[in-house]
Every structure is written in structure tokens, then in C-alpha cells.
Design a protein with these regions (language model features):
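A donor-sugar binding/catalytic signature common to diverse glycosyltransferases
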Residues: 50-62, 75, 234-251
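Functional cation/ligand-contacting sites centered on basic and imidazole/sulfhydryl donors
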Residues: 21-22, 168-171, 182, 201-207
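Short, well-ordered alpha-helix to beta-strand connector turns
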Residues: 44-47, 68, 244-246
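Well-ordered, non-membrane alpha-helical segments in soluble/globular domains
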Residues: 57-58, 182-193
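N-terminal pre-catalytic "stem/leader" segment of glycosyltransferase-like enzymes
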Residues: 6-61, 172-174
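A nucleotide-sugar donor-handling region in carbohydrate enzymes
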Residues: 83-180
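Catalytic donor nucleotide-activated moiety binding site of glycosyltransferases and closely related
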Residues: 191-233
Length: 251
């Protein structure tokens, strides 16, 4: 029986052509993609792997189309690491999508299909999902898991604070913005809408962690320098932050 199982495992492992040297250098990539044998050339490839919708995937996508091979899109996992990727911290998870990618609104994605099929999933799967969500909230898990809790003396923890509105910024030029049907004007509209809809509230703008560490630019940094608008320019655990505001705006 063990021999048959080993043979079965060998048959389901496919040769995956990954043109990107950067992807191939991801630590423990073979563990994250156990169903693939990773190849740096296209000979004998049964699938092609690239990173999301970055322009650098053009070569990989063209090769997949030319040879009629499935293309697998990867992205950072939603619970990625214990530090920023731009600071060199390796991923502990990745998103794997054989249909599209979750932030692309122009086509379906595997995540979208899973969500649409939620009503038909086994009760055990739904229970496991609920358990995972509860675990995330209980332990304040996030994408990078490096930021401290909101401090006890932070104004957002004050029991006498006014209604509080949080606006979420993003890194400039992020693929999720472009393929999510948004641009810089969308962020400006969101910002002005938040101000207009909440005239008596304190407005807080949360800067993206990659902007805080100086690696990237944001959309709202300059807009945030206005009356009754506060810029959260420090690392804060996102769940800790969300638990201390009344309303959230995001693109």
C-alpha cells in the first residue's frame, strides 16, 4: 500500500516552469508548492508560474499561451510573515490561483469561486473556516505580524474621544489598485467623501507599512495634512486599530 501511495504522489507532481529568478529564490518554495517540481527552463513543463499580474509575468504568460499550458498566479499570502517583505522577511504562505488572481476585477479568480461555492461546502469546511477567523481575531494576526498593539495612552483609546473614522491608504501603483478599477482619483474621492459624511468626527489616515519604512509612496499622505485629519504614521497592529474606531473607509 505504501508503494502505491508513493507512486501516486509521483504521478500528481507536475513540472512547473518558473522564469522568474526572484520567485525561485523564495525560501522553502518547494514546501509552499508541494504539487510541483520547480524548473528554471520550459523543457517538459506542465504548468507555468508567475507573480500575480506584474508586468514581469509577460514572459511566463506568453510561454504558457504559446504552449497551451496552465498559468498559475502567485501572491503574498494573507497571513504572510513576521515582518515586512520589503525588509527581507520570507513568506510563510502564498496565494495560489489557477484561474486569475483575487484583486483582478476583470476576470474570475479561485478565491471568488470558493466564496461563491460557500453554500455547498461541507459543514466541516465551514466550521474550520469559522475557527480560523476566530483564531485570527483572538491572536490579532495580520499579513506581516510585526506591529505592536495600539498603546494604552494612544488618543484612539481615550473613552472621551469623539466619533472616529479610519481611512486606509495603499501603496502608490499597487497592482490591486490598477486591476481593482481604481486610481489616485478614487483615493481622493474616498477621502473627501469621508470628510463630508462625517463632519463632526475625528479622521485618521492609516499609512501602509511599506510607506512607513520608506520603501514606497502612498496616495493620501499629502491630503492628510488638513484640519481634523490625523496621520497614523506608526506601525500598529491592524486588528487592534480596527477595534478602536467607529467607521472605516477603504478602496
Amino acid at each position: 500500500q505504501s508503494i502505491n501511495n508513493n507512486n501516486r504522489r509521483k504521478r500528481i507532481v507536475k513540472n512547473a516552469y518558473i522564469p522568474s529568478r526572484g520567485i525561485r529564490k523564495i525560501p522553502h518554495l518547494s514546501t509552499l508548492l508541494p504539487e510541483f517540481h520547480i524548473c528554471k527552463d520550459g523543457k517538459g513543463a506542465e504548468a507555468v508560474v508567475g507573480w500575480g499580474l506584474r508586468p514581469t509575468t509577460h514572459k511566463a504568460r506568453a510561454f504558457a499561451a504559446e504552449h497551451q499550458l496552465p498559468f498559475i498566479a502567485l501572491e503574498d499570502g494573507f497571513l504572510r510573515s513576521v515582518g515586512l517583505g520589503v525588509a527581507g522577511y520570507p513568506p510563510y504562505s502564498i496565494v495560489y490561483d489557477d484561474i486569475g488572481i483575487y484583486y483582478d476585477t476583470t476576470r474570475p479568480s479561485r478565491l471568488e469561486q470558493l466564496i461563491l461555492a460557500a453554500d455547498t461546502m461541507p459543514s466541516e469546511t465551514l466550521a474550520q473556516a469559522q475557527q480560523a477567523m476566530d483564531f485570527i481575531l483572538q491572536h490579532h494576526l495580520s499579513k506581516y505580524n510585526h506591529a505592536p498593539e495600539l498603546s494604552d495612552d494612544h488618543p484612539l483609546r481615550s473613552p472621551s474621544k469623539p466619533e472616529t473614522v479610519l481611512i486606509i491608504d495603499q501603496t502608490f501603483g499597487d497592482m490591486a489598485i490598477q486591476y481593482g478599477g481604481a486610481d489616485a482619483s478614487t483615493f481622493e474621492l474616498m477621502f473627501q467623501t469621508a470628510l463630508n459624511e462625517n463632519p463632526q468626527a475625528d479622521i485618521w489616515v492609516k499609512t501602509h507599512p511599506d510607506v512607513l519604512c520608506g520603501k514606497k509612496q502612498g496616495y493620501l499622505t499629502q491630503l492628510a495634512q488638513q484640519h481634523r485629519v490625523h496621520l497614523l504614521a506608526e506601525d500598529i497592529n491592524p486588528i487592534s486599530l480596527l477595534q478602536n474606531v467607529d467607521k472605516v473607509y477603504c478602496v
